[in-house]
A protein has these predicted regions:
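Structural and coupling elements of P-loop NTPases
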Residues: 1-314
């Protein structure tokens, strides 16, 4: 039977380069207690590729998770470029809503249009976070109008147009629901995420279905497949069937050596995970994006979004 995982929210962050996405995620991590007070935060937690740190762009989507009052919020970064079409779509299939981060002075930029369009097409609810609200030249009211115009241009539904706005200064560590609210902390953004973004749902007792949406690599364990559990429960040492994305007849029996969930900036080993969890599995040498981890008795693949090759010239 389908049930909701009320203790989880899976969100993607969409933002233009330099609109403060990484500072925002740093601040959410900091205020949810991931970093100790005296710990140096390497600014820009999400950009772990060197190219990305240098250019401030996100190519491989990154995963972090924060906890707020008993709810785990998995935060997935999205590539900001239309050049990464397939990846954007696959990342968005892992989440139940998005946070669009917009600079309070610059407003909505063309670069976010592509990812936002995909999110709206997938019928995902959007929270708009107007960031850098403390800039002297901030013009939040006009920026809201611009964002809503962009939504209309991208054929947003009435529900999507009725989205919540949150004003923030990630750098100063506060968010507000109304412009004249007190400057306290990030709680208004946490609350909006938990209350507005739906919980993931699935059938924990059904056969396992986990679509691999991204691949990570580690020299000790090799290829690591990352995705969201749509149905069923996955356990360490479980025998599963890996079904090939391009050829569902191609199936391979494999064993789950290690299973991880995300916590803060780390992958944490777990013995089992169930619906709604974003997990990483290791020990499968030839695992690829788009493969589905299924039960041996009932290997049903999840339809796969083909990846378009990156066209960005470095």
């Amino acid at each position: 039977m389908k049930t909701k995982r009320e203790d989880i929210r899976n969100i993607a962050i969409i933002a233009h380069v330099d609109h403060g996405k990484t500072t925002l995620v740093d601040e959410l991590l900091k205020q949810s207690g991931v970093f100790r007070e005296n710990q140096e935060v390497a600014e820009r937690v999400m950009d772990s590729n060197d190219i990305e740190r240098e250019r401030g762009i996100t190519i491989l989507s990154k995963n972090t998770a924060v906890h707020y009052k008993g709810t785990k919020i998995n935060i997935i970064d999205t590539p900001g470029h239309a050049d990464f079409g397939g990846e954007v779509e696959r990342v968005l299939k892992m989440v139940n809503g998005v946070v669009l981060v917009v600079d309070a002075f610059e407003g909505a930029m063309p670069q976010t249009k592509f990812v936002l369009k995909k999110a709206l097409e997938l019928d995902l609810p959007v929270i708009v976070c107007i960031n850098k609200i403390d800039r002297p030249e901030a013009r939040p009211t006009e920026v809201i109008d611009e964002v809503l115009e962009l939504f209309l241009e991208l054929d947003a539904s009435e529900e999507q147009l009725d989205c919540p706005f949150v004003y923030a200064s990630a750098k100063s560590g506060y968010a507000m629901v109304e412009l004249d609210d007190e400057h306290k902390d990030m709680q208004p953004l946490f609350e909006t995420i938990v209350n507005y973004i739906p919980a993931p749902e699935g059938d924990p007792d059904a056969d396992i279905q986990l679509l691999i949406s991204t691949i990570d690599y580690n020299e000790y364990v090799g290829r690591i497949g990352i995705g969201k559990i749509d149905n069923g429960t996955l356990k360490v040492n479980q025998e599963v069937m890996m079904v090939n994305a391009h050829d569902p007849e191609k199936q391979k029996r494999v064993k789950i050596n290690k299973l991880y969930e995300f916590d803060g900036l780390a992958k944490v080993e777990v013995n089992e995970a169930t619906i709604g969890a974003i997990v990483a599995v290791s020990g499968i040498a030839d695992i690829h994006i788009g493969d589905t981890i299924c039960s041996v008795d009932n290997p049903v693949a999840i339809p796969f979004q083909k990846i378009s090759e990156p066209t960005i010239a470095m």
